[in-house]
């Protein structure tokens, strides 16, 4: 029902969903869903088609899904953009060996392994590959304490945006707008009521 509210005035142009595996037992082991994540992703894709909303899919490639072939499943979902990211370890976020819920070190893969996944899916036209080097300083990561994390300085935290402005917090981290643009972080122009794209209205990712 909530999507219908956006249908008349076209205030919703794009929806992003994350799916790391189309095998639900793997998704569950990675913390996505309770064994039914694929069903909900497919439902989201159906809603996007029904309401003429562009679908974007994010996938993080790690040890658990490295050998999976997702070509058919991605084709069925028909996203306009499929962002495939090499799993990235950030100190303070997913490298806490004392807390299994926050320790993903065993899931890390090499650049060469990541490229085997990309090679397998190279015929998927909407694929956008992001190895680790494209990640560094090109993302803003926000932890549960509402602090931005550095992606190149060992997970260094900023002040919480509950205490300072977002602009001030960004000044404290290593985010680089040039690298953000370089990795194609600005890519989507908003559509007007006639389904035509408008200059200057963009989505960032």
Summary of predicted features, one role per range:
Residues 2-4, 69-70:
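Short acidic active-site motifs
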Residues 3-23, 79-90:
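Non-cysteine beta-strand/loop elements that form the S-adenosyl-L-methionine
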């Amino acid at each position: 029902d909530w999507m219908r509210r956006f249908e008349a005035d076209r205030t919703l142009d794009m929806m992003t969903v994350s799916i790391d595996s189309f095998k639900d037992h793997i998704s569950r082991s990675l913390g996505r869903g309770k064994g039914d994540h694929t069903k909900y992703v497919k439902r989201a894709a159906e809603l996007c088609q029904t309401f003429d909303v562009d679908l974007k899919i994010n996938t993080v490639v790690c040890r658990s899904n490295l050998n999976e072939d997702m070509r058919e499943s991605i084709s069925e979902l028909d996203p306009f953009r499929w962002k495939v990211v090499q799993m990235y370890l950030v100190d303070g976020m997913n490298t806490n060996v004392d807390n299994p819920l926050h320790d993903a070190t065993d899931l890390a893969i090499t650049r060469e392994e990541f490229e085997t996944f990309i090679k397998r899916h190279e015929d998927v036209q909407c694929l956008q590959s992001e190895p680790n080097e494209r990640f560094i300083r090109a993302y803003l990561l926000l932890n549960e304490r509402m602090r931005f994390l550095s992606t190149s300085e060992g997970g260094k935290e900023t002040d919480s945006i509950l205490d300072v402005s977002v602009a001030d917090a960004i000044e404290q981290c290593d985010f680089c707008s040039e690298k953000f643009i370089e990795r194609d972080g600005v890519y989507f122009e908003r559509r007007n009521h006639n389904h035509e794209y408008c200059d200057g209205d963009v989505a960032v990712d």
